[in-house]
Amino acid sequence: MAIKLEVTHLYKIFGEHPERAFRLLEQGLSKDQIFEKTGLTVGVKDASLAIEEGEIFVIMGLSGSGKSTLVRLLNRLIEPTRGQVLIDGEDISRLPDGALRAVRRKQISMVFQSFALMPHLNILDNTAFGMDLAGVPRAEREQKALNALQQVGLETYAHAYPDELSGGMRQRVGLARALANDPDILLMDEAFSALDPLIRTEMQDELIKLQARRQRTIVFISHDLDEAMRIGDRIAIMHSGEVIQVGTPDEILNNPANDYVRTFFRGVDISHVFTAKDIARRRPVAVIRKTPGVGPRSALRILQEEDREYGYVLERGRKFIGVVSIDSLKQALRGQQPLEQALLPAPAPVPASMSLNELISQVAQAPCAVPVVDENHEYLGIISKGMLLQALDKESTLND
């Protein structure tokens, strides 16, 4: 994947004469110590990130960690003190005002926690408001606004007013307003945090659907760990203005950078994070290669030699065919039937992307370990009851 948005050694010092803070940072003083000595606030300290085109990149941290400051540095709503912000390789921190406005209009949009809808404007005009300020002709901006409302399922409310909409619907309007100019990059600063839990989940689903239809680069600020795990391709953890760790949810869960990250992720429900492919194992299991010379007798011999009750039948190229047992193979032999007649109706294979939470009932009810397949139906391995319990036990280990 190409790098869409890159941040290199980015700093933001709030206050006059920020060079004083840099001298103290070089001496190893902390953010709090610098504030005590100078009154200067270190908002972001030496942040470096490379965000890929089309990914949802979540930035997390406690209040005061610098996450909202960092996202505003990406479109220069806050001016960086030092460092670079590159969009498609161009350093926007050096752009003159006119060129910066063009970038904001065409390439990057932002959704805030507050809906900030104009009560005297209908939903269509609220969605088109930014384009109106930019001088876009009325017919063009209304068409773009209507297209954006269609994307979030609100086209029938185009002529309604904000007070006629629920909180979740008003936030959809805020999202539509950001989508109206079809940006490549979408910045979302705790955009769903003011919503009720059920509505928040609906908005997360909406964002995932939008991303499936049109791959944008999304930088999403959140303090909600479940939200980050649910929507994020990768997560950055911030603390005291610094980026502490960047990785996929399972990378961070398995290898936290320090005690702060470990504590931050305490209590996470890993059954919604890990998937079948994360815990599937190819051994120990009896694999039967389906070739012209292999029938029930050959398959039965393989199971007996490996002391297995069940076997997993694969075609050339590891394409999964099904599961057989010693009993089903003996029955096929008695009836002089081919190997296909020995295949069991269960367990059915599960997709690699299935979450552990969804796997629980399937694994619990299966007579043997459940096979896992990829999108091409190729065999990846098996998941037994013991393997699933061991994986779920990681949650209690994390929370100890």
UniProtKB/Swiss-Prot annotation:
Domain CBS: 280-339, 343-400
Keywords: Amino-acid transport, ATP-binding, CBS domain, Cell inner membrane, Cell membrane, Membrane, Nucleotide-binding, Repeat, Transport
Taxonomy, superkingdom: Bacteria
Induction of synthesis: Induced by increased medium osmolality. Repressed by glycine betaine.
Phenotype on disruption: Uptake of glycine betaine and choline is completely abolished in the ousA-ousB double mutant.
ABC transporter domain mapped to chain residues: 29-265
GO MF terms, alphabetically ordered: ATP binding; ATP hydrolysis activity
Gene3D superfamilies given in the database record: CBS-domain, P-loop containing nucleotide triphosphate hydrolases
SUPFAM superfamilies: CBS-domain pair, P-loop containing nucleoside triphosphate hydrolases
CDD domains, sorted: ABC_Pro_Gly_Betaine, CBS_pair_ABC_Gly_Pro_assoc
Compartments it resides in: Cell inner membrane
Cellular component, GO, one term: plasma membrane
InterPro entries: AAA+_ATPase (IPR003593), ABC_osmolyte_uptake_ATP-bind (IPR051921), ABC_transporter-like_ATP-bd (IPR003439), ABC_transporter-like_CS (IPR017871), CBS_dom (IPR000644), CBS_dom_sf (IPR046342), Gly-betaine_transp_ATP-bd (IPR005892), P-loop_NTPase (IPR027417)
This protein's record includes keyword Transport: yes
Sequence positions that bind ATP: 61-68
Topology versus the membrane: Peripheral membrane protein
BP terms from Gene Ontology: amino acid transport; glycine betaine transport
Subunit note: The complex is composed of two ATP-binding proteins (OusV), two transmembrane proteins (OusW) and a solute-binding protein (OusX).
Job description of the protein: Part of the OusB ABC transporter complex involved in glycine betaine and choline uptake. May also transport several other osmoprotectants such as ectoine, DMSA, DMSP, proline and carnitine. Probably responsible for energy coupling to the transport system.
Family assignment from sequence similarity: Belongs to the ABC transporter superfamily.
Protein name: Glycine betaine/choline transport system ATP-binding protein OusV
Protein species of origin: Dickeya dadantii (strain 3937) (Erwinia chrysanthemi (strain 3937))
